[in-house]
Amino acid sequence: MKLAGQTAIVTGGGRDIGQAAALKLASEGASVAINYYSSSAGADAAVQQIKAQGGQAFALKGDLTKQDDIDALVAKTVEELGGIDVLVNNTGGLIARKKIAEMELDHWNAIMDLNLTSVFMMTKACLAHMQTGTIVNLASQAARDGGGAGAVAYAASKGAIMTMTRGLAKEIGPEIRVNALCPGMIDTDFHNVHTPDAARRGYEASVPVRRQGTVEDTANLILFLACEDSAFITGANIDINGGMLFS
């Protein structure tokens, strides 16, 4: 197994990309700590599935914009699972579409706290317990193209994740590798809420693969970046969008 004997933390692991990633890492031998904020049923279901297959896992609710919640997650992971080898920084969101001219500072700060500052805080807390390993960040296609109307703040936060990924890879290598993936249209609750159906159909018609991505597509890439199959890759921001950039 590609991650036998290793421990992974997956933030935002109660649904969609995070849940699929937690299950995928566990299927390759990792013990998994699943952070969630509101998706308790999905997080618990993932833990039950992992344990049913002979693995180790737990789920813990936490707001990763709060230091106490981060500290609790890291401490429980180290105590119960024995350390930290893989960190998947998946927590994030758009919150709501708001154009810059109409946006309050509080909304801007909330997006930055959720998508960027929480990644800094989580990464710093985990690095205290990582001698070697991998960090996988979730950026976005929006960081490449600026996002749609009302998503400028979201795109900016994800652009910062891409830059932080490159810089951190230089700062903490060679012992720890850091990479990010930049998903395009993935069939998730995020797009169910924030992307009109017509836009989703248009995406499917325009990209070379003629479909939206699945959470399994992203989980496969997360596994690749987390394990030694990608041993010569660090500081990379990898597109996973069905060919959107050149369609």
Residue ranges and their predicted role:
Residues T123, S157, T165:
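Active-site helix of classical SDR
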Residues T7, G14-D16:
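Conserved glycine-rich cofactor-binding loop
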Residues A128, A169-P174, A231:
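Alpha-helical segment proximal to the catalytic Tyr-Lys
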Residues K98-I100, H107-N109, H191, A199, ...:
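Substrate-binding pocket helix/loop in short-chain dehydrogenase/reductase
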Residues L94-R97, A205, R211, L223, ...:
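Short C-terminal tail/terminal secondary-structure segment
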Residues M103, G146-A155, G167:
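Active-site loop-to-helix junction immediately N-terminal to the catalytic Tyr of the SDR YXXXK motif
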Residues A101-F120, V136, I161, V209:
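Catalytic Tyr-X3-Lys loop
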Residues S140:
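Residue(s) in the substrate-gating loop at a strand-loop-helix junction
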